[in-house]
Amino acid sequence: MKKLTIVPSSFRLLSIGSYVELIEANGRDRLFCRGRVLHAHLVTSGIARLTRIAAKLVTFYVECGKVLDARKVFDEMPKRDISGCVVMIGACARNGYYQESLDFFREMYKDGLKLDAFIVPSLLKASRNLLDREFGKMIHCLVLKFSYESDAFIVSSLIDMYSKFGEVGNARKVFSDLGEQDLVVFNAMISGYANNSQADEALNLVKDMKLLGIKPDVITWNALISGFSHMRNEEKVSEILELMCLDGYKPDVVSWTSIISGLVHNFQNEKAFDAFKQMLTHGLYPNSATIITLLPACTTLAYMKHGKEIHGYSVVTGLEDHGFVRSALLDMYGKCGFISEAMILFRKTPKKTTVTFNSMIFCYANHGLADKAVELFDQMEATGEKLDHLTFTAILTACSHAGLTDLGQNLFLLMQNKYRIVPRLEHYACMVDLLGRAGKLVEAYEMIKAMRMEPDLFVWGALLAACRNHGNMELARIAAKHLAELEPENSGNGLLLTSLYANAGSWESVVRMKKMIKKKRFRRFLGSSWVETV
């Protein structure tokens, strides 16, 4: 690709098309300083006021992580019409600024902005990634109000959103309400079923689309492979691969990556490595997604030999420079206890992103290096790097492990008030653990009761563990009751409560719990070692 460069001292008037190319190149490569110089030139020459140029500048600033600067350019646009809003919302959604895109829409809608069909997919994408059901369903209502429900692209986005929420029934209703479904809509629904452990329903839908004369494409087949692979149905995966070939499609990199992903998901790591080798023997070269999918198998078993081989392959092929690959490598080294290797890799990263920062903070947090985690978090804030929900999960984990109760509570509030990030289950689990370790069990329980969502087993598990450490029988019973409802087959929670009764000298309760565990035939989840046997 031809590199576009600018020399500040020798600017001359160029064509509008050339300026557009320069702005796009600076945004793509995140050349913020160079783009600012170009922006200044465009302002002095009067070109910045052109709608097309202003729209490109908005996108440039969002790509560089400068949302406030993007907003300033938008506010100075000569025509703040729907097209400008489409650019602003779309740029935020494409670059991961999901909350900003929703906030911007709320503001514009309050000022009289009518919902435009071009904005809807971006808003639904943001709602999906933020798991903001309330906002997503509000947009769905507006879609019905403005009669956009026959737009196939919008319908596909709605199906994707509801599928991500786990509301497959609502996704199917949206699908069924569309008069004439095309391949894109079918693929969205098939993927929705596959991603929610309903691969058999996905396969039935493929049969339906064939009856309607719509031929499946490679995306259709790969969705089925992914679904059955994650459900650990190897026989069906083989069957789908055969059907795919009979239909004229050869399994591609995505197909093999889906198989590997399912194997890793089900802790069949040796089979995942074998599938990786088979992929190579078929003449297919792994991409960044393949590497990212396979590396967690190395962190689970601490197979550093495999991990280093994959790292070496990434270096040779240039995939190491991919941000998500670099992040996965950091995660692998960190989980295997090789902190120094992770630190070296992080320092060598030329363009650090939110993803790489998050991985390194997690690495420090999980090894008790809270001071370094906080230092890195402060660096992100100081440099204006985007902080997302994972950033706060990582730093709250660090605070919890180090007993930094006040700092953790302040960061939890900062996350909501300054960065407008709605707390997720993982944030609450961190906070319950943080408060529990500090002995603030009542405060932890009050936080659970105030949650806007149903607490999961990690939240209740954190409370039960804290109750055991501090001997709070009353709250322990409450936590154990909820855990028994969420995970009825796991005896571990009952054994934890039994241990608590024993420590308190309540032997009658110990006998009662053991009888209950035996009667219900709870399954005990065995531990495993991360140490590779040689």
Swiss-Prot record:
InterPro entries: E_motif, Pentatricopeptide_rpt, PPR_At4g14850-like_plant, TPR-like_helical_dom_sf. The keyword Metal-binding does not apply. GO terms for molecular function: RNA binding. One of its GO terms (biological process) is RNA modification. PPR repeats lie at residues 50-80, 81-115, 116-150, 151-181, 182-216, 217-251, 252-286, 287-321, 322-352, 353-387, 388-418, 424-454. It comes from the Eukaryota. Belongs to the PPR family. PCMP-E subfamily. This is Pentatricopeptide repeat-containing protein At5g59600. It comes from Arabidopsis thaliana (Mouse-ear cress).
